[in-house]
Regions:
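Glycine-centered loop/turn motif at secondary-structure junctions
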Residues: 42, 81, 120-123
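Alpha-helical elements of Rossmann-like donor-binding domains used by nucleotide-donor carbohydrate transfer enzymes
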Residues: 29, 33, 71-75, 114
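Short, solvent-exposed loop/turn segments at secondary-structure boundaries
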Residues: 22-25, 64, 103
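Asp-based, Mg2+/Mn2+-dependent phosphohydrolase catalytic module
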Residues: 1-10, 113-121
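A short, structure-level motif marking secondary-structure boundaries and short turns
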Residues: 19-20, 57-59, 99-102
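A metal-dependent, Asp-based hydrolase signature
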Residues: 54-96
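Substrate-recognition element of Asp-dependent hydrolases with the DxDx(T/V) motif
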Residues: 90-96, 101-107, 112-126
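Active-site neighborhood of HAD-like aspartate-dependent phosphohydrolases
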Residues: 2-12, 17-51
Length: 126
């Protein structure tokens, strides 16, 4: 007899699962937004894009000894060649404010709300 482990949580990938979008259009607008937000602080838009991609790649290979945030910023500043004071906070400001504009690049999935509610009603963490 096979014993099935109890499912305690359900993880959804927003990018295309619960939140329909054209990934390439979304990414283009995302990078335009964050690069424009950071540019006045001395990081050229293309540098911001390149360093963000490098940091993201480093997170994919994270061995778990550091948080993804730590790995990202360590890689970002290594690529930049210096550690700029306050850049992580300025980037966070974009996520609190400017990121909302990217909603226009996404669609709605009428089943998304139902899927999340069903998971919650069945005692699962989401």
């Amino acid at each position: 007899m096979t014993v099935r482990p109890e499912i305690k949580a359900v993880f959804f990938d927003l990018d295309g699962t619960l939140l329909p979008m054209d990934q390439s259009v979304f990414a283009k607008e995302y990078f335009k937004g964050i690069a424009g937000h950071i540019a006045p602080y001395g990081i050229a838009p293309q540098q911001m894009i390149d360093f963000t991609l490098a940091g993201t790649a480093a997170m994919v290979h994270n061995d778990g000894s550091q948080t993804n945030e730590q790995v990202f910023w360590k890689t970002f500043f290594k690529e930049l060649g210096e550690e700029k004071e306050g850049i992580s906070e300025i980037a966070a400001e974009f996520y609190y404010n400017g990121f909302k504009a990217l909603k226009a690049q996404t669609g709605e999935n009428p089943l998304a709300c139902e899927a999340v509610k069903t998971a919650h009603c069945n005692g699962r963490k989401v």
